[in-house]
Amino acid sequence: MLSRIEQELAQLGITNVKEIVRNPSYEQLFEEEMKPELEGFEKGRLTTSGAVAVDTGIFTGRSPKDKYIVYDETSKDNVWWTSDAVKNDNKPMNQATWQSLKELVTHQLSNKRLFVVDAFCGANKDSRVAVRIVTEVAWQAHFVKNMFVRPSEEELLNFVPDFVVMNGSKVTNPNWKEQGLNSENFVAFNLTEKIQLIGGTWYGGEMKKGLFSLMNYWLPLKGIASMHCSANVGAEGDVAVFFGLSGTGKTTLSTDPKRKLIGDDEHGWDDDGVFNYEGGCYAKTINLSEENEPDIYRAIRRDALLENVVVREDGSVDFADGSKTENTRVSYPIHHIDNIVEPVSKAGHAKKVIFLTADAFGVLPPVSKLTPEQTKYYFLSGFTAKLAGTERGITEPTPTFSACFGAAFLSLHPTKYAEVLVKRMEEAGSQAYLVNTGWNGSGKRISIKDTRGIIDAILDGSIEKAETKELPIFNLAIPTALPNVDPAILDPRDTYADKAQWQTKAEDLAGRFVKNFEKYTTNDEGKALVAAGPKL
């Protein structure tokens, strides 16, 4: 007689399972990862911190070129499909190709000993999604146990998955050329069958970000904001969310001894307030030190899982070594961080919404207060810029415009996310701020001390009492003085020896904003927002 879970796997096409290890304990996972007979990327290595380290092979990051969504009645009118005009990662896949990939993965997982992890994506019971992850690799089960919300014994008894992830990382697709796909590897979603298939890539983040893409599909259609942001809450219950692309300071600035962390990367905002999607953190570890990021450093202990780090012969980790990848990572359960919201990672409505940008052009002010229209404009623009070296040794800024500060994970059109976010903000009486953690006319990056002073002024409300003036071209309201912030930096023009230099750079950057925003002007709502952007 097949067990309930065996029957459910058989319905998916996974048959003759030798053994099901369901929701293993951390102790069990440790024993599985340490088995001497394991080979290749299945093998775990114990480090002196107590955490296990694994390698993910040639894939040390996500593989967006291999991401597909089945084009059918459910998805065709909702998904933000890639097009010649606006490229994104949501490529259509036909039903026949999906069927053949599904058979590849279910065949790979049949006749095996499997790990089945049942978990929730979303800390709020009313909005969460029940997820089942099926894999033959112990550390992949460990990764999802760390990253998603772990159910209670009682919840497991009656667990019915809304969505299934079948991870067949050991199998590749021999027919990819005939099927018109990018490569033999695949990350495919079927929104009707509610299944994600993974093949050829071992990278753990495909499961995490795959489920984020799904939450980004389902929740906004129900009027719930879905956000690529960190979030924290003060002693008075005041919630702040921090949007920003990689490297702008999301994790650093939301980790604040005066406030409790709700989560560091993915959140929803429903009728109850802001809630974390995850039960863990997935932190970058390149050049990690206890001095610079004590919370993350101390979270790397037993039950944490390191990816693609260099482990020395004595078992210690060389965090400065990026020879495998710059994208070295660690996943750990959120309770490895001390100052968190417990027992459930959720809080009330956000009163402060902070957009972080690292402007390498040296144009934007360190902080400005946004109108509702500007909030939509800068959210849709999703701007940041990096400094990249050029041949002649000049470092020139490279702008990045990533819609909603997370274009890679958007399943619907960006204007949908802006509309839902602003509606939530209006209902909660929230205020948005644009905070530049990048550079100014001095050629130096704005100091973390000044940025923390700015964040404090936003969170304690003192920015509301400050006098403001308008910055030309961008028409942004900037404060003239804030407590514990160097007043000389608040107007970016004052950081240039020659103010005409700022003007030239500002015109250049404004032109880039205008050009980027053209893609949103195909509908009336987008056209109406142009006035909130820079004026040349």
Curated annotation (Swiss-Prot):
<dbReference type="GO" id="GO:0005524">
    <property type="term" value="F:ATP binding"/>
</dbReference>
<feature type="binding site">
    <location>
        <position position="62"/>
    </location>
    <ligand>
        <name>substrate</name>
    </ligand>
</feature>
<feature type="binding site">
    <location>
        <begin position="244"/>
        <end position="252"/>
    </location>
    <ligand>
        <name>ATP</name>
    </ligand>
</feature>
<feature type="binding site">
    <location>
        <position position="451"/>
    </location>
    <ligand>
        <name>ATP</name>
    </ligand>
</feature>
<keyword id="KW-0312">Gluconeogenesis</keyword>
<feature type="binding site">
    <location>
        <position position="329"/>
    </location>
    <ligand>
        <name>substrate</name>
    </ligand>
</feature>
<feature type="binding site">
    <location>
        <position position="209"/>
    </location>
    <ligand>
        <name>substrate</name>
    </ligand>
</feature>
<dbReference type="GO" id="GO:0005829">
    <property type="term" value="C:cytosol"/>
</dbReference>
<keyword id="KW-0210">Decarboxylase</keyword>
<feature type="binding site">
    <location>
        <position position="209"/>
    </location>
    <ligand>
        <name>Mn(2+)</name>
    </ligand>
</feature>
<keyword id="KW-0963">Cytoplasm</keyword>
<dbReference type="InterPro" id="IPR001272">
    <property type="entry name" value="PEP_carboxykinase_ATP"/>
</dbReference>
<feature type="binding site">
    <location>
        <position position="293"/>
    </location>
    <ligand>
        <name>ATP</name>
    </ligand>
</feature>
<keyword id="KW-0456">Lyase</keyword>
<keyword id="KW-0067">ATP-binding</keyword>
<comment type="function">
    <text>Involved in the gluconeogenesis. Catalyzes the conversion of oxaloacetate (OAA) to phosphoenolpyruvate (PEP) through direct phosphoryl transfer between the nucleoside triphosphate and OAA.</text>
</comment>
<dbReference type="GO" id="GO:0004612">
    <property type="term" value="F:phosphoenolpyruvate carboxykinase (ATP) activity"/>
</dbReference>
<feature type="binding site">
    <location>
        <position position="329"/>
    </location>
    <ligand>
        <name>ATP</name>
    </ligand>
</feature>
<dbReference type="GO" id="GO:0006094">
    <property type="term" value="P:gluconeogenesis"/>
</dbReference>
<feature type="binding site">
    <location>
        <position position="209"/>
    </location>
    <ligand>
        <name>ATP</name>
    </ligand>
</feature>
<feature type="binding site">
    <location>
        <position position="228"/>
    </location>
    <ligand>
        <name>Mn(2+)</name>
    </ligand>
</feature>
<dbReference type="GO" id="GO:0046872">
    <property type="term" value="F:metal ion binding"/>
</dbReference>
<feature type="binding site">
    <location>
        <begin position="445"/>
        <end position="446"/>
    </location>
    <ligand>
        <name>ATP</name>
    </ligand>
</feature>
<dbReference type="Pfam" id="PF01293">
    <property type="entry name" value="PEPCK_ATP"/>
</dbReference>
<dbReference type="InterPro" id="IPR008210">
    <property type="entry name" value="PEP_carboxykinase_N"/>
</dbReference>
<keyword id="KW-0464">Manganese</keyword>
<keyword id="KW-0547">Nucleotide-binding</keyword>
<protein>
    <recommendedName>
        <fullName>Phosphoenolpyruvate carboxykinase (ATP)</fullName>
        <ecNumber>4.1.1.49</ecNumber>
    </recommendedName>
</protein>
<dbReference type="InterPro" id="IPR015994">
    <property type="entry name" value="PEPCK_ATP_CS"/>
</dbReference>
<feature type="binding site">
    <location>
        <position position="203"/>
    </location>
    <ligand>
        <name>substrate</name>
    </ligand>
</feature>
<dbReference type="InterPro" id="IPR013035">
    <property type="entry name" value="PEP_carboxykinase_C"/>
</dbReference>
<comment type="similarity">
    <text>Belongs to the phosphoenolpyruvate carboxykinase (ATP) family.</text>
</comment>
<feature type="binding site">
    <location>
        <position position="228"/>
    </location>
    <ligand>
        <name>ATP</name>
    </ligand>
</feature>
<keyword id="KW-0479">Metal-binding</keyword>
<feature type="binding site">
    <location>
        <position position="265"/>
    </location>
    <ligand>
        <name>Mn(2+)</name>
    </ligand>
</feature>
<comment type="pathway">
    <text>Carbohydrate biosynthesis; gluconeogenesis.</text>
</comment>
<comment type="subunit">
    <text>Monomer.</text>
</comment>
